[in-house]
Structure formats: structure tokens, C-alpha cells
Amino acid sequence: MDAPRALAAKPPTGRKMKARAPPPPGKPAAQNVHSEQKLPHDATLGSQQSLVYMKEALQNSTLDITVVLPSGLEKQSVVSGSHAMMDLLVELCLQNHLNPSHHVLEIWSSETQQPLSFKPNTLIGSLNVHTVLLKEKVPEERVKPGLTKAPEKSVRLVVNYLRTQKAVVRVSPEVPLQNILPVICAKCEVNPEHVILLRDNVAGEELELSKSLNELGIKELYAWDNRREMFRKSSLGNDETDKEKKKFLGFFKANKRSNSKAEHLGLSGADSDEDPAKSASGGDLNGCVTTPNSPSLHSRSLTLGPSLSLGNISGVSMKSDMKKRRAPPPPSPKLLGQDKVSEKASLSSQADLQKKKRRAPAPPPPQQPPPSPVVPNRKEDKEENRKSTVGVGRQVPQKPPRGTARGPPQLVLPPPPPYPPPDTDVTEPVTFPGEGAGSETSELRPKLSLPLGPGSHCSMGGVSQVPAESEETASEDTTEDSGVMSSPSDAISLDSQQDSMRSKDKWSTDQEDGSDQDLAGTPELGPQKSPSWGKSGSGSSILRTEKATMPTNDDEDLFITGHLHQTLAELDEDLEGMEENYETDTSSLTNSVNGVSNHSLQEAIIPDSGVDDIPVTFIGEVSDEPFDSGLFSSRCNNATTFNTGSIASQRSHLSPSQTEHSQPFVRTSRKEPDPSPPSQDNRKRNQPTLANTSENENPVETDPTVTSLVSKLLIDDPKAKDKGKVHGSSHSEKTQAGHGINSLRVNPRDGKDESSNSAPPPWSHHGQALGGSYGLKYGLTTYKIVPPKSEMRCYDRDVSLSTGAIKIDELGNLVSPHMNGSRTISPPSAVVETDTPPIGKVKEFWRRNSMEKYLNGPAECTIKRAPSTTITATPEKPQQDNGMKAAFTVTTPQQQPASQEYGAHLEEERSRPQSAVSCSVKVPASNPTDITFLKPQRRTSSQYVASAIAKKMGPPKVHADVVRPHKATTEQCHEEAKLARSPPTRKDDAAPNLHSEARQHEHGTNQSSVCLPSNPGVQLPAGGHPKVEVNSTYGKSSTQDYPAAVHRNSYFLPGRSSHRDRVSVGQSCGFNEKQTTSNQKANSTSNFSQALDKAHPPPLLLAEARDSGRILMNGSARTPGNCEPPHSPKESTLTSYIILQTEEKPSSLSTDGQDADDTLPSSIFGPKKKFKPVIQRPLPKDVSLHSALMEAIHSSGGREKLRKTAEQTSEGRPKKPSYVEAESERSALLAAIRGHSGTLSLRKVSSLASEELQSFRNAALGAPGLDKPQQEDLGLPPPPALPPPPAPAPQAPSASVTVSRFSTGTPSNSVNARQALMDAIRSGTGAARLRKVPLLV
């Protein structure tokens, strides 16, 4: 406490410091200061004390003073001596009605007759006052400062002089230029006599000195010194000299040199802007010797003298960048001046020089002595120009390894379309525009391209082929081409042991090129150096070595043509050998599994050598491809094992037409959008493969069947892969033979692509894997896609032979690749894909594989799961799961709105661990092992774009045992969800919904189950894609139109058919929305798939679907006996009960829903009619009573129905106390209503009650339109009518009756009355509430 007080007491430090400022030097001063400091303190004390004393002394004293008013009037007054002067002023002003603020006091002493100075608080008694003058204040006239002088306006004038120099001067824009000229000259250090002001140094327009800057409208001018710059026009317009001057920093040295040279040559300075002699001497320069006197370019060229060798000429013509290129002089420059080579070189184009620069470093041993490199360079340049493979115009540091590697690839660079193994002639003619001299080169290309297939343009059969002219220009940009071209040869060299070192160098160079290629999005499909090339076979490597040697010969063309035939034969042998080798290799297992893809890939010569898991640049396109994602992913996984060489060789066998077709396939596959999001998942998985597949895509798409087989093969576990070897090889043979056919078959789509293929197919650029190790760096739209962890890994990592390969779960869903060699193409869906989208194919493949395994071992599991229907349905995959869930809700468009809400309920339920249906839907692997597989899928779906497949496969599957306990809960969940959404969807279903609701409450368990609320009479059009609300266990619900893709996904295994049958059975019960739990599960899963399958049933599944009675006719479709799989007794009871319910009140359920449905064109699967989604909230349990009452009122014939419904609902929930009071008409009416006794009981009770009921009936009839909307709106109880003044209870009904009776004409009144009654009933308050709210309108 003390510290704060001390601080508070302390004066501010700033003031203290000022008060104690150091005193002036000298002790006396210090003493004076101290005394002064002390005196004021004492004085103040004394004054204060004296004041007190004076006040006391003067308090009783009075003074007689003379007051002189402002008007001059004098007035005598007596004033107390204790008054202060200010007080005196105020008093005097008050007495004389004056304003104190406008007056002042002036005191005259009686002795001195002089005015006295005083303070406002000075006591009058202390002063010797005799006269007081009261004067008006004179306002002091303040001298207003004069207007500030506005600053003179000025602008910044930019003065250019001596061509390159600038100066900025601030001058007035209003002043004539002649007044500004001295300032400009002073700034520029020039003589005003020799300066002429020009508008600019180009036009040379002279400015009038009499005009100002504003008049001329300029802020920049050129001050031309007519003495320094003799040649104004020529020099001012000489941009080159300006650049030269700017570039040269050593002005003085450059000037001296140029001057001396100019003088020596006898130049009068025509090129120089200033007199060389003066510039040299510096005279008349005014210190501004900043510009070179003569253009260095001309002087240099002249000084070169007679030696106008190519190098010198290039030095003159080439730019600085060219100079840099020439920096590392190749060994040949000396020879150029001496030999004929020099003459040829002088004629060679700058492109040749550039290439020289690149090749300047001594070529690897394979190249010829220094003189030869020049000529080969030219040839290479020509080839490169035609093929744009070497990147003619590229200005890049020399890459010696590339140079060596380039030689062979240059010849090959223009890859012709796939060359039939023996048909070199055919391939040769295939040249691209701009390959003027390329007939030979084209021949060479086929040869080289065969071995180069994996990395070379040739591999794509013209992927990078572009008109030679364009290629030359593009070569620099598309260094990818050159890099790629070298890379193919490099890849081959990798195969060859002799070229192993060279291949390493090329490897690095290719990678560098790959980085360059990334910019251009190298079109080359073939991955440049997949290790698989090593496997490709010594033959291919030998070919490459031969090729490497071939370019060295001057007769390259002939030599190459000769080799072409040889290489073709060798390739054929190599292909056979390699195929065998592939099969033998463990990696070949996957390759053989991919055999189909390999052969198909043959079409695309691009073996998966690029399998570097390089996601192909065309990510967007990938999704479009109908190829099996499984195939792609398997490729990616097996890419390393893939023997791209074999593929390349195989592809070489393919006829060019086949390859062409295959190429279109690749394109079309990418182009064709996958309707189903799952396909996107496939894309994700496949994209890495697509990089490979892009090369291989041609075969991939060749045949949907082939693709399906391939995908299956790829997907299958090692066992499947082993099978795949045989099957793949056989299938690959089929594909080889049938590639043309397949490609043709696919070509209807691809036809478009074929046309584009003639030009370097754009997809080829995308598909081409660029630099060997830079798989991810690709121009175009390359997205670095981390290959999704293959789902197969999730299946069984132990079983997988290849790390990335898709694996088969224990159930073997993906096990047998050849089980379903032919893919059933779903009926043409809205989607462009003629073939089922890759997702559908993959899923189909999975299903079939799983079907095989199901037929064998997994059949047992399927049987166990049969009760849970959903499990068998699950083989469809996560996509199915989502789709099935969606289908459950979507079975009918009408139900979609409800199903959405319902879907929300389902999602909530699913979130609970008991999600039997959703889990079962996800049963693709119907084992806990599958669950592990599925979980990674779930991650994949979240991690990768549009992983619909992952979603469908993701959710863990519920085992049969788990499903059974959940069956009842599932039913309840389904029913609850149905109730929640069905009331808005169908008024008639309200009661059944209640019942289901009650059932759910009885079971008291919520299960995440997908319910297929199928409105009776709602039929899905055969062609229509039911909108599927996908409620994934993830909690996501996506309503999507699932075309063939979804249907493909929804194809069921044999086990599933039984589940579907169950679903249909539940539907046949007529209680579509309330199906037994197992049925509901099956129905949800199977119905979803059914709806999908119905829309596009796979050929195999159509019969199955029919057998399973998937066709739902107004919910009355009967499924064959086999359709009903084991139902738990509870299920059967529920089903029968539901059937009874629906039959008991068929009219109420079906009248509205069926009528609405019948009006619309309907197919077997239901009406196409769509309803706007209605936001539905779970309604109170009494909603069903209300709906039942309304139905009874409308139909007046459903009393029995209503009674039964009430009984049903009463089972589920405790009956409400019936307030039956015989003495009260009102109570009787309420009792009748509660008991659903109908009008008869009311009539029996009393006439008043009957009248009221009749009035309700009339009101309902009078405003039927109102009733329905209200019924629909029951989800939110209408506000009760405002209670009128209370009336006797018995009279209320009658009053309401009369009012309603009269108000039939005015529906609003009847609506209010009816709403009030409805509210009472709905709220469950019963008679008590009605008593409280008498309906007196």
C-alpha cells in the first residue's frame, strides 16, 4: 500500500526533471536558485496565510467606490472589502443589467490615479481602490493571414539524349520550350546551341520551341545533339545499335576499339552515331561518352576478315545464346574450315549448329571420328526435324550420352502405326506429313519402333508423329519427344548388356529429357525405361544395339531397311520366346495374368515398360475409359513385372490396322465418361496403370470381354494369376487375332478416335509415360497420383505376387481372372460407354470371380449369409453398397424423396454398429477378411477422387450370424425410415407405416439397414436408371442416376439372387415399404441391385433376376419359391403379418399410390413418375391414426380397415385411455373416433354425433383437394383452430357439425374444424383435448 501511495504522491517525473533542471554554473547561481526555489514555497504559504488573515480582517470592512459605467454615468456604491474583483464585476453588471462576459473592471488608485493591476481573486479591501471603471471589452481584431500562394504547377519531363540516356527535369508545363531548354541542356550536359528538341528519336519530328508542354501534349522528348549525333535519322532508327550499346558495359573500351577499327577500315562513321575521331579523343562529348561509337556487330563481322567460316558466320548471325552453345567447341570446328565438311557446314541450318552444340562433346565410341559427327548430325537433324524426336531446335547443354543413344532412336523416331511383324513394307508407307525425306526414315522407324515400342514414339505407332516441320519447331518444346525417342533406344540399350553403360547414361539423359518432356507432355506412350525392358529379351536389346550402330553408317537407310526385316523376324522369335519367358517368370505370372492386356497392349506397342506406376497424364480421360480398372491397376501393380518388350514385340506382330484400332480404343476408353462414380475409383486405381495402360490402352479396350478378362486376371490372386498365365496367354492370342476385330468392335466408339489417330493422337501424348523415372512429371494435365494402395493388397497381401497387383480375398471374389472372360455389357446406358464402365467391368469381374469361388468354397458363406441377404448382395462392391443403398431408397422415383429422408435415418442407423444391411451390402468379400480389405477401400474412397468402388466395397460386412440378430432391428429400421418418409410419399401407407413403426418400437433396436421402400404400383421403367440414393456407411448419401455402371456393380452372384428373391418376396407381400428384416436387407441390397439390374441387367444376371422375381409389379410381384432364401421365423411372421395388413387395407394403401402410379407410363419396374423430395420428419406415433381416420372419412367404407389398423398399432404401443362417457355425446363421439367404430357407432350413440360425423364427411367431400394436401402435410401437425369462447361440451360437436355442414362451400372453415380434430387425435390428447378446444367457427 505504501508504494502505490508514494507513486501517487510523486509528481510526474517529467515535470520534476524540468523543475530541477541543472542550475547555471557557479555557486552563487546555485544559491540563488535554491533561494528562489524556497522563496516561492514560503511566499505561497505566507500569501495563503495572509489571505486568510486579510479576509478575516476585511470581512467586516466596507469601501466606498465610484463606479463609472460604460455609458460614462458615475455611480457611488458601497462594497465589502472581502469581495474579490471578479465578484465585484459580476455584482456591478447585475446591478446595471450588463453582461459580465462583455465587460471588464479597471481600477484607479486614489493616490496615484493610475490603473492598478489585479487578479480576479484579489480582494477589493487589499487594494487602494478609489474608482472602478466598468468598460466593454473591445474584440481584438485578428489579422487574417493572406491567402497562401499556390505553388507553381510543374511536371516531370523525361529527356532522352544520346539515344540511350535519360534525364528527368521538373519544369512548368505552361512555359514555352525555349524557356525550358537551358534547364534541359544543363541536365544533359550539352550545349544549347547544338540541341534540337525532337518528339522522339524514331520519327525525328522537331518540336516548336514557342509551344509549351501542355500545348504539345508531351511529357517526354528527345534532345538531339546535332554535333554529336551526325546521322540522326539512320542512327535514331537503328535499334540494333541501341541494343549493342546497351549490351556493352565497357563503353570506353568498346568505343576505342570500334573507333580504331572503323578508322582502320576507312569507315567514316556511317554506322557510328558520333564522329569517331571526336569520340576517340573525347572532344565535344561534353563528358557524355556513354555510347559505343560504332556498332560492334558490323565492326566485328568486318574484322573477321576473309575467314568467313561457318563458325564465324554463325557468330555474326547467331545470337548470344547461340554463342553460348558454341562455347564448348566440338572437335570438328577446325576441320570445318579445312575440309569439305566446312563447306557443308556453312550450308547447314542453324538447327544443325544447335544440334552440333548438343553433340559437341565427343560422341560415345559408337559414333565415328570427329569429322563424321558433323554429317551424321545433319542427317540426324533431318530425321529429328521430321520426327521432332530429337528436339531439333532445343538449346540445351550437350548431353553426350543422349547423343549416342539418339543415333538409333533418331531413325526410329517417327513411329509408324503398329507394324505387323513381317509387314515392314506396310509399316514403311505409313509416314506422317512433313516427313518429306522420310520414306527411308519411315522404313527405319518401323524397325526401330518395334524394339523401341516401350519408350519410343513408335511404340504408340505414331503417337508423337507430327508433320516434320511442326515437329522441328515443337521439338524444342516437346523435348519430351527427343527425350522419349532417346529413351526408347535407351530402354532397349538397357536390355543389351553391351549398351548397359550407355543405357545408364541415357537413363539419366532421358530423365533429364523427361523433365523437359514434362513441359510438353511428351506424347510418347511407352514408359521409357521400365525394368521390364530388361526382361523384354536379348533380341530386342540386340536390335537396339544394332540400331545404335546402324546410324553411324552413311547408308543408314539401306542398312536400317535391311535390319528392319531382320529385326522383324527376330522380334517374332523374341516375342514367342519372351512370352514363354514371361510365363516362366514370377513377374511373368502377373504378366501372363495380364496376358490379355499384354496382347492387347501389343496393339499399343507400348508395353507396360512404362509401368513405372507413372500415372498417365490424362487423369480425366482415365475415368472415361471403359477399361477394367482392375486391368489397369493390375498393370500398374504388375507393371514392373510386365515384359514390355514382349508387349512391344507382340504389338509389332499386330497389323498396323489393329494397332490403329487399338489406339482409338485407348482414346475412346479415356473419352468415354464412366457414368458411375465407382469408375472414378477405378480411375484412381487405374491411373497409375493408365500411365502404363495409356500405352496398353489400345488393347485394353479392344474387347469388353478381353478387358473384363484382363481385369479379372489382374485382379485375381496369385492363383488367379497362374490361371491367368494360361488363360491370359490364350486370351492374348485371341486378342492378337481378335485385336483387329475387337478394336473394330470397339471402334464404333473409337472410329472418332481413329480419325484423330491419323494425327498424333492427343491421347498418345497423354498416355505416353514420359521420362523413364519422371513418370509423374508430364506436361499436359499430369496429376501426380499416388497409386491407390491396391484393393487387392487389402484382400490378401500374403497371396499377392506383385506388390501392386489386385489380390483376391479368401472368398476369392477377385480370384479367377478367366472365370468370366466375357463381360456382359449392360444394356446401353445413358452413358457414352458402349462397354460397361471400367468399374462395372471390374465389379463384374470381381463378382464372377467371387461367383466361382462362391460356387466352390464361398458358397457356404453365401448360404450362411443368405438369411442376411445383404451379404450376398455385397459381392457387388462398395459401389454396389452405395448403389444398393441408393437403390433401396430409390426403387421408385417417388420414393426417392422419402428415401432420402429415409436414407438419413438409414445412415443414422448405419452409424450404429448393427448396420446389417449396409454392411451386408458391402459384403463383396463376405468375410471379416473382406472387412479388412474394405476398410482400406474406405480410406481409398476418402483419399482418392470419386472412389465409388472403394465406397461400395469399403463398409465392413456383417456376418450371417450378426445379420440375423439384426434382422428384426433392420426391419424396424426400415419400417421407421419408411414411416418417416412414406407418409409424405403416400398417404395411404401411413397406417402400414405406423404398424412398421410399432414393430420397430417393439423390437426397440435400430439397425442400419437399407430399406427399399417400393411403393406398390411403382414400377421402375426397364430403361430407366432408378435414381439411387447411396447411403454409405460413411454417412454420405449421394443420389445418383446409376446407369450401366451401377447395374454392373449391382450384378449379383448366385447367392445374391436368393437375396434378391427375398427382397422380391417382401415386395410381393405387398408391404413394399415394410419388408422383413432379412427381406428388407435383401430387398435393400437386392432391390437396389434389382432396380439397377432391371434398368441394365447384365445378360447373365437377367435370367437370375427374373428367377429371383426382381420384377416388382405394384409391390405384388411374386417371387419363385427359390427366390425366398431362408427367412428367420420372425421374418416369415413379419412378412405374413405385413401381407395381412396390406391385404386388409388394400384400398387405402393402393388407392392413391397406385392411381398416381397408374396414370404414369410404367414399366415392369415401376412408374417413371418423380416426386419432389419432401422434407420429412419422424411423425408422432398417432400419425397413422390420423391417416386411418382420414381414409375412413374419405372412403366411408374402411371402418373395418381402420379398426384393424388401430388394433395393429395398438399392439406396438400402449393403448391410450379411452375416455368413454355414455352420458356425454361428445365423449361418445370421441370414443367412436378412437375406436374407429365408424359412422355406425356414432349414429347409434346420438343424432348429434352422427350429424357431426356426416358434416366431416361432407367437408371432406367438398374439399377433397384440401384433404390430400393436408394429409401430405401431416408430417407437421396443423395449428389447431383458435379456441372460440368455451361452449358446453355436448354442444361443441353439434356446433362444429353445423358449421362444417354450412362451410362445405367454404373449405377453409371445414379445414379448420377438421384440422383441430386431427390435431387432437394426432397429439394423442384424446377427448381431453377436444373438450378444451370446442370447434365453434
UniProtKB/Swiss-Prot annotation:
Chain coiled-coil ranges: none
Modified residues (Phosphothreonine): 522
Stretches assigned to the WH2 domain: 1185-1205, 1225-1245, 1313-1333
Motif (KKRRAP 1): 323-328
Record's subcellular location: Cell membrane; Cytoplasm, Cytoskeleton; Cell projection, Ruffle; Cytoplasm
Region (Disordered): 1-41, 260-556, 647-768, 892-923, 967-991, 1070-1094, 1113-1133, 1145-1168, 1192-1221, 1262-1310
Amino acid composition bias (Polar residues), ranges on this chain: 288-317, 484-500, 647-666, 687-710, 1070-1090, 1297-1310
Key word Electron transport present: no
Free-text tissue specificity from the UniProt record: Detected in brain cortex and in the Purkinje cell layer in the cerebellum. Detected in hippocampus neurons, and at lower levels in testis, lung and spleen (at protein level). Detected in embryonic neural tube.
GO cellular component terms, semicolon-separated: axon; axonal growth cone; cell cortex; cytoskeleton; dendrite; dendritic growth cone; membrane; neuronal cell body
Biased composition annotated in UniProt, kind: Acidic residues: 469-480
Gene Ontology biological process terms, A to Z: actin crosslink formation; actin cytoskeleton organization; actin filament network formation; actin filament polymerization; collateral sprouting in absence of injury; digestive tract development; embryonic axis specification; floor plate development
PROSITE patterns in UniProt: WH2 (PS51082)
GO MF term list: actin monomer binding
Membrane topology note: Peripheral membrane protein
Subunit structure, as described in the record: Identified in a complex composed of COBL, PACSIN1 and WASL. Interacts with PACSIN1, PACSIN2 and PACSIN3. Identified in a complex composed of ACTA1, COBL, GSN and TMSB4X. Interacts (via WH2 domains) with actin monomers. Interacts with DBNL.
Name recorded for this polypeptide: Protein cordon-bleu
